[in-house]
């Protein structure tokens, strides 16, 4: 694939757009509300548009992109917080991202985005006794298949997994930054969804295969 485009929700200082550029992907727009990170990305990626508050965005009225990335707020999912989960004021913003993605797909007859990438803290897997991560998986699968139901695991969520449906796939795993050139231990969940095929696992599991 070539000439892929990217939109970044909860953009922060532009980590996903910068990584995309390093892989030959063109960032088109971002959503962020904090002034300083916006200044950083405006200087670093001047061609990328900024749409501000995600709650005021309509995914059907912005430029369609191949990939939407989002590291939705983790404060209510983190082991360091009060753990209100997806019902918390900040982490419930996850559902705003789902809304924007659905709006874009509806306006493009399901063509865009084909891919999404979600990033969050490992605590998301245990928040609300694992129910929050089940909700994350189910809401993402429902972008393509409204009838899907994701069951809870018998014990707890594993550090990696894959769902393959009818012409879509979702894969997730925990990655540690220390194995990717960063001098610190920083474990995060990464989830890839492919809404037009079974390539999510191929994308996610081919990188750093030895380090889960």
Language model segments and positions:
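Conserved SAM-binding strand-loop segment of SAM-dependent methyltransferases
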Residues: 47-53
């Amino acid at each position: 694939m070539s000439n892929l485009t990217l939109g970044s929700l909860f953009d922060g200082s532009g980590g996903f757009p910068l990584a995309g550029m390093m892989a030959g992907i063109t960032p088109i727009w971002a959503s962020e509300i904090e002034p300083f990170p916006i200044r950083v990305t405006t200087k670093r990626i001047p061609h990328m548009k900024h749409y501000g508050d995600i709650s005021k965005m309509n995914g059907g009225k912005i430029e369609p992109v191949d990939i939407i990335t989002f590291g939705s707020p983790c404060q209510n999912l983190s082991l360091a917080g009060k753990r209100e989960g997806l019902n918390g004021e900040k982490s419930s913003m996850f559902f705003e991202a789902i809304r924007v993605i659905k709006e874009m797909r509806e306006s493009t007859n399901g063509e865009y985005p084909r891919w999404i990438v979600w990033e969050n803290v490992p605590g998301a897997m245990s928040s609300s006794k694992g129910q929050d991560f089940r909700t994350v998986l189910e809401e993402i699968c429902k972008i393509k298949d409204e009838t899907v139901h994701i069951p809870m695991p018998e014990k707890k969520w594993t550090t990696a997994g894959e769902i393959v449906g009818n012409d879509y796939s979702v894969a997730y795993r925990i990655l540690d930054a220390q194995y990717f050139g960063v001098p610190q231990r920083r474990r995060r969940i990464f989830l890839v969804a492919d809404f037009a095929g079974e390539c999510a696992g191929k994308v996610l599991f081919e990188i750093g295969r030895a380090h889960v």
